């Protein structure tokens, strides 16, 4: 007899941050969201490939994020609004 298992996938929490400009650089956005403490820390985690932008690994700290874009770091998702 085969038993069926029900699996629940826990959704990652999404934190929304409003910007007042056309875009924001990825490193500045991580600081704005308090995902990192300093710009230096942001630089290292981005260069090490620990950050995803819109679901894809991004190693460019100067990446421009616009409203609707998401950044994922340490199992948390941050959305630009």
Sequence positions of predicted segments:
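Ferredoxin-like alpha/beta domains used as RNA- or RNAP-binding modules
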Residues: 1-33, 57-81
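Residues that recognize and position ribonucleotide moieties
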Residues: 22, 44, 51
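Short beta-strand/loop turn elements enriched in aromatics
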Residues: 32-45
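Residue-level recognition of conserved structural "scaffold" positions that shape functional pockets
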Residues: 46-47, 62
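Short, structured beta-strand/loop micro-motifs enriched in basic residues and often containing a Trp
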Residues: 49-56
